[in-house]
Structure formats: C-alpha cells, structure tokens
Amino acid sequence: MGNRQDGNKIGMAVIGYGGMGSHHARKVHAQRRDKFDVIGTFDIKEERQQAAREKGFEAFASREALLSDPRIELVVVATPNDAHKEIVIDALRHGKNVICEKPVTMTTPDLEDMIAVANETGMFFTVHQNRRWDPDYRTAKEIVESNTLGRVFNIESRVHGSRGIPGDWRNQKEHGGGMVLDWGIHMLDQMLQLMGDRRLLSLYAQLTYITNENCDDGFRVICNFEGGTSYMVEILTNNFINLPRWYINGENGTALVRDWSRRGEIIKVSNWENRDSVPIQAGVGITKTMAPRTKKTIKKYPLPKPKSDWMEYYDNIYDVIRNGVPPIVTHDQQRRLIRLVEAIFECGEDGKLIELE
C-alpha cells in the first residue's frame, strides 16, 4: 500500500472529532501506540478542535492542512454520513490510506466511485465495522457455527431503546440519519457475516416514524436465506420494555442472549421420543401442544463466551498497510451491505416483498 515503511509506526489522523472520531483517536492512542502514532485531528467546530488539543492531539487548521501533512499515512473519516464520499476521495487523492466510518455511503453508485478512486490511486480504503467484535454477537456466532442447536432455522436480532433518535444530524434524513443507516448498518453487517456465502433470497421490511415523521426512528426486516433460515433484524427507539438481544431456534433447541452482557441460556432437547405432555390450562381452554416440556426431556446449558477484542480491527489495518495481508472488511462486503440497505428502503416505501440474490 501507499507510503509503506516496513517496521515503522503508521501516522494517523482523524477528520471529524465528534463521538466516533474522538473514540478512534483515544482508543488507538491508548491501546495501539506501538503501531500507530495518532498525530492530530480536524473538525469544523472549534469546540471539538479544542477538545482534541486538550487530549494532546494536534488540531489542524483545515482539512487540506491535515491531508497535506507527509507524516500522515492513514486518515479516519468520522463525519456525518453525507460528507463521507467527498472527504474519502479527497484523502485518497492526497495519497492517504482511509478508514471510513459506517455507513460508508448511502448509495451503491457513491460507493463504486470511492472504490474506483482507491483502485486508481493504489491506496487502501476500508470501512469501520466494529460491531463484528461485540461480545454478544460473538456468542451468537459461535452458537450458530458450532451446530450446537442443529440446523438453525430462525435468528432474531434486536436492539431496543426508548429515547428516539439523537438530536444531532442523525435525525436528519438529508445527512444520512435514521436507524437503518445508524444502528441498522451494524446489525445487518453482523447478519451478512453470520450467514456467510448463503444467498439472501428475499426480504420484507417495515420502517417506523414514531418520534420523527421525516426520518426512520426504527425498522424491522425479515430476511430469507438459502437453506431455509429466516433472520429478523429489529431496531426500535420507542420501546420501554426491551425484548432479548438474540433469540435463536434450531432443530434441537433454543438459545437466548438477553443483553450486551451475554446473560442467557441454551436449552436443548434430550429426548424427542418421550411423549410426556399432559394437558394444561391455557386461557379459557386446555392444550397439550403448548404444554411445557418436563425436565426429563430437556437440558439447560450456559452460553459460550468467546473472547473478543475490537482492537483486532486496527491490528488488521496495520498488517494490510505494512505487510500486505487481506483486509477483514472488504469492498465486496460493503457492496452487498449497501445493496441490502437500498432494498430495505425500497420495501419500506412500497410495502412489497423484495427478491434479491
């Protein structure tokens, strides 16, 4: 990649020193200073420039000044979503490797333009998909991939809140706000990673506008994958009682992950043949079909808790630039993700099932 000097630290800077931009700068400086030198930042708001100075970072006077600095090899773009394309292309043309915050952009044509410039300049360009390292996701991933439940036919992934959309650019559609592009882009990326190369056959989506009539404050999408797996992603911001973070059904049992802290359990059937059900009262009637299983026919297990370190993302960035290894987050993955987002918006507008791959 461009500006390779094997064995040296990578000079890094951040454009957009808000919540995520400051997070990148602080975390990398604290945890990976052996590989990266966080030189400075630029933000159009002076109070953020001052905040960067107070953390010991150089606050560049302009974007051009930052991009023209030969010490900087890697630029993190953490601006509002609608500004990503212009800044990413500018950085690439200045000979910088680029990490762009998610969503990389809002349309497939814009993404293709960015990739084209990366190819033209020979610079490395990728996207920050940090929630591939969320502990709860890693637990769900291990449950599915280990075949613990047998063939998995249903996965439900939920994130619920009760505060609506944040009161900054994230509630403005023209700036790329809304929950599909905010939280949704994370959970949809997790879904595509979890499903691997299985084709996404169709989807049905509903968008909500409870707290903001112009910008989606929530959505629900059901995706049907090759092999018979139904995968639901639900992001809602007006829920005062949260449903579980993950609910996974397989032929041999069910897994429940209650929250980010990975509280939950796995229950597996131990004896399918034991016909031990007796009628129970259900409302004003009785049922054997819905009678709970006895302890003789099921067994409870703790959730797996694989280790997860988000800084592996930056370790990979270093190895891509210095050693030429493949990136974890690829262009093709982002192409598929943005096409999925476009399909969700299309379905949310016309209410029709969308057939995909």
Report each predicted region and the residues it spans.
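N-terminal Rossmann-like dinucleotide-binding module
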Residues: 1-55
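C-terminal helix-rich "cap/oligomerization" subdomain common to oxidoreductases
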Residues: 1-9, 74-77, 304, 312-357
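Hydrophobic residues in well-ordered beta-strands that form the structural core
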Residues: 61, 77, 100, 125-127, ...
